[in-house]
């Protein structure tokens, strides 16, 4: 009775304190778009890290540019559409209107992009120490210019088509992210203009060797230098290079679509020619009159224009690093190949999962057992059915091949291929058709929802009984990105989860109303409700026992409903530790609001992608893994799965992992009460959590090797190799 009275008094006291603070004030929140720009700047910071090899620093600069392209194509494009429609309602956190957001984006991003180009120019100069020089054609010797001219005539000139601009030739429809050269020509009768679009399929740079030196020349500089080949008989007066980014956030018309595949294909064609949202120009461009004309043709504003001190589109550095890494391997990361999973060892994945849950932590641990999980099922005559969701897969996916083989072997194969996975639509349309041709039953997703869940179900007949094996994960079934993204997964034969998995796939197939689940929590809506319930229970537990604690690891936090609950928990005294790699709309450490909340972002060699949710519950912890971030879109616009971790040893690994990341003083940045990020500084020994986990995984792999055991998965040694980030072009967005 005494404890109950104490609890009621504490709750009344908390409610009184809550009434004194208005948690809706905009100064307690970060704007989503500006928070994303700050994340992208943390990516750029990696190009300054003295512990990163030179070529990897260049890769981070390239990633920064690749990220920005998508940001403009989707987020900026969406804001511009709102402004055009006259929508001026502030967003619900930092209370900024669309136009205010666009203005703030321009200011912040201009500063960050200027920093990027400053760093790019510094690093390019460092390459000269290794006999690699970026040059203009006019800087080359006569002999090298002659070689360059031959290469231009052989490999570049045949691909170019000048597009005249006059009364008979209107302004051409230039492709999204295309690189173009504007040309003024004196035709004696008048000064006319033309545009030369540089084909995306030709190399972005050419290389020339002379002695020990290698010269790198940008293809746009080569074309400009030899531009007279395109306009023989005329005098070329001026040229400048420009790049256009277009709106790619177009609407897929699902309602009334007879065939979603056909609608997606129409959408992909439309995306290539959306309205312009950004114009990039070389800062040395002096052709103001032509630039003004171009601006008018593209119907863009001053906020959309960026003058850059170097080559446009620094994503070319992915290719340059790949080229140079063959010669300069010692300027790339020491190669790491994922090790055998500690939870699996040398056991058979199906036999062991009948005994206990199996945990996987990629890429420290190999993704190969997950590939084998599907491959073995396809080959096993005891397999009755395979069901799987696919959101993003590699272009030569072994999982796709196994699913096709399974169907050809007479198994019942059901695959949900999410056709609306942004910028993977074309790839997924291809796989959907191929799987259908192989005899798989293919589901295209759910109307107005993206199926982002990561789940695979294998049903086998064992001893005349059907047994279900379920894999649940935080990341995609993509064997390529599984080497670069940190993700987690569990394989289980838990009967409640197996029943849930069966009901989940029936629901996706459209032959079932929304089911009641035993263990799985499924969005839309249910995940948010469970989070609210668990936070409320943690508050009550803390008021009674004084040991409330919440830890969450995710990619982004934007959902205001959950942020408000976290504020409430903080005000009640619950300790909250958030590991958020990207967007964070919550400001921590504000007295009376979020003083008990800590936010840490880790950006490093690997892309942090796991989602873990921990509630202390007076030492009876509830721990979950999920495909979902705490973003509004994940809560209400996607089909997501949150699943409990009930194995105590796996739960402890997750807690240890989060504590390790919170202690990272090399790649960790903490957010202050103003929303600014700072590197974690303490007197502890240097700790890079990603490097630490790599070394621990290698130790385990070596232990298995000493036992002369053939492990499940691929044991790997550490050695130098080519750049890992070449495949990371879209890494830091998802």
From Swiss-Prot:
Q: What EC number(s) is this enzyme filed under?
A: 2.7.4.1
- Which cofactor does this sequence's record say it needs? Mg(2+)
GO cellular component terms, A-Z: polyphosphate kinase complex
The organism is Staphylococcus epidermidis (strain ATCC 12228 / FDA PCI 1200)
- Name assigned to this protein: Polyphosphate kinase
Which reaction(s) does its UniProt entry say it catalyses?
[phosphate](n) + ATP = [phosphate](n+1) + ADP
Q: Which residues form the PLD phosphodiesterase domain?
A: 447-481
Modified how: An intermediate of this reaction is the autophosphorylated ppk in which a phosphate is covalently linked to a histidine residue through a N-P bond.
Q: Which residues form the active site?
A: 452 (phosphohistidine intermediate)
Any one of the GO BP annotations: polyphosphate biosynthetic process
| Keywords on record | ATP-binding, Kinase, Magnesium, Metal-binding, Nucleotide-binding, Phosphoprotein, Transferase
* GO molecular function annotation: ATP binding; metal ion binding; polyphosphate kinase activity
Enzyme kind, highest EC tier: transferase
Q: Does the keyword Mitochondrion apply?
A: no
Physiological role? Catalyzes the reversible transfer of the terminal phosphate of ATP to form a long-chain polyphosphate (polyP).
Q: Which residues bind ATP?
A: 67, 485, 581, 609
* Recorded family membership: Belongs to the polyphosphate kinase 1 (PPK1) family.
Looking up InterPro entries in the UniProt record yields:
PP_kinase (IPR003414), PP_kinase_C_1 (IPR041108), PP_kinase_middle (IPR024953), PP_kinase_middle_dom_sf (IPR036830), PPK_C_dom2 (IPR025200), PPK_N_dom (IPR025198), PPK_N_dom_sf (IPR036832)
What SUPFAM superfamilies is this protein classified in? Answer: Phospholipase D/nuclease, PHP14-like, PPK N-terminal domain-like
Record-annotated residues binding Mg(2+)?
392, 422
For this protein's source organism, the top of the classification is:
Bacteria, Bacillati, Bacillota, Bacilli, Bacillales
Q: Name one Pfam family in it.
A: PP_kinase_C_1
Q: Where is this region: Disordered?
A: 705-734
């Amino acid at each position: 009775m005494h404890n109950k009275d104490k609890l009621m008094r504490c709750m009344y006291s908390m409610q009184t304190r809550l009434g004194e603070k208005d948690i809706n004030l905009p100064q307690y929140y970060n704007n989503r778009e500006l928070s994303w720009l700050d994340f992208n700047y943390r990516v750029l910071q990696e190009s300054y890290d003295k512990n990163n090899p030179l070529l990897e620093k260049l890769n981070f600069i390239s990633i920064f540019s690749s990220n920005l392209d998508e940001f403009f194509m989707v987020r900026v494009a969406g804001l511009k559409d709102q402004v055009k429609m006259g929508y001026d309602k502030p967003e619900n956190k930092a209370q900024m209107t669309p136009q205010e957001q666009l203005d703030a984006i321009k200011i912040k991003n201009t500063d960050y992009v200027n920093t990027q180009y400053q760093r790019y120019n510094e690093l390019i100069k460092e390459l000269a120490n290794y006999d690699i020089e970026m040059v203009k054609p006019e800087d080359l010797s006569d002999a090298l210019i002659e070689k360059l001219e031959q290469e231009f005539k052989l490999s570049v000139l045949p691909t170019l088509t000048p597009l005249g601009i006059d009364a008979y030739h209107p302004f051409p429809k230039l492709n999204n992210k295309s690189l173009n050269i504007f040309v003024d020509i004196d035709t004696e009768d008048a000064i006319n203009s033309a545009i030369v679009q540089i084909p995306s399929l030709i190399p972005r740079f050419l290389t020339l060797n002379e002695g020990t030196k290698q010269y790198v020349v940008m293809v746009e500089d080569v074309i400009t230098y030899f531009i007279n080949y395109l306009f023989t008989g005329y005098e070329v007066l001026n040229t400048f290079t420009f790049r256009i980014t277009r709106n790619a956030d177009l609407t897929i018309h699902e309602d009334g679509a007879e065939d979603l595949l056909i609608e997606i294909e129409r959408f992909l064609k439309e995306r290539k020619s959306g309205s312009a949202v950004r114009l990039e120009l070389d800062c040395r461009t002096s052709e103001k009159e032509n630039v003004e004309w171009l601006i008018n043709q593209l119907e863009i504003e001053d906020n959309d224009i960026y003058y850059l001190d170097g080559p446009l589109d620094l994503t070319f550095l992915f290719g340059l690093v790949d080229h140079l890494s063959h010669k300069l391997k010692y300027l790339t990361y020491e190669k790491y190949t994922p090790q055998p999973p500690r939870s699996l060892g040398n056991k058979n994945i199906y036999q062991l999962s009948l005994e206990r849950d199996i945990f996987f932590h990629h890429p420290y641990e190999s993704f190969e057992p997950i590939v084998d999980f599907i491959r073995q099922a396809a080959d096993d005559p005891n397999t009755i059915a395979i069901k799987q969701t696919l959101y993003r897969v590699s272009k030569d996916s072994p999982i796709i091949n196994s699913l096709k083989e399974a169907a050809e072997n007479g198994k019942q194969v059901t695959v949900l291929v999410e056709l609306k996975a942004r910028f993977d639509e074309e790839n997924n349309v291809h796989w959907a058709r191929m799987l259908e041709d192989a005899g798989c039953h293919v589901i295209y997703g759910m109307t107005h929802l993206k199926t982002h869940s990561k789940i695979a179900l294998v049903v086998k007949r064992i001893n005349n009984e059907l047994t279900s094996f379920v894999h649940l994960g935080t990341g995609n079934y993509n064997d390529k990105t599984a080497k670069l993204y940190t993700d987690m997964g569990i394989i289980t034969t838990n009967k409640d989860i197996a029943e849930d998995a069966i009901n989940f796939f029936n629901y996706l197939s459209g032959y079932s109303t929304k089911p009641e689940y035993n263990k799985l929590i499924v969005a839309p809506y249910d995940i948010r409700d469970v989070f609210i319930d668990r936070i409320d229970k943690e508050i009550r537990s803390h008021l009674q026992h004084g040991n409330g604690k919440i830890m969450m690891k995710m990619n982004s936090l934007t959902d205001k409903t959950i942020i408000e609950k976290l504020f409430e928990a903080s005000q009640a005294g619950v300790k909250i530790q958030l590991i958020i790699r990207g967007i964070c709309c919550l400001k921590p450490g504000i007295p009376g609001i979020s003083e008990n909340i800590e936010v840490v972002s880790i950006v490093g060699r690997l892309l942090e992608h796991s989602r873990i949710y921990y509630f202390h519950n007076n030492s009876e912890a509830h721990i979950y893994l999920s495909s979902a971030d705490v973003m509004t879109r994940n809560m209400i616009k996607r089909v997501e799965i949150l699943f409990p971790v009930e194995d105590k040893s796996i739960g402890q690994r997750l807690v240890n992992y989060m504590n390790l990341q919170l202690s990272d003083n090399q790649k960790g940045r903490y957010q202050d009460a103003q929303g600014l990020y700072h590197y974690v500084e303490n007197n502890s020994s240097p700790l890079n959590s990603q490097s630490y986990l790599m070394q621990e995984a290698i130790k385990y792999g070596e232990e298995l090797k000493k036992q002369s055991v053939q492990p499940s998965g691929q044991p790997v040694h550490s050695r130098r190799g080519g750049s890992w980030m070449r495949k990371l072009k879209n890494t830091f967005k998802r």
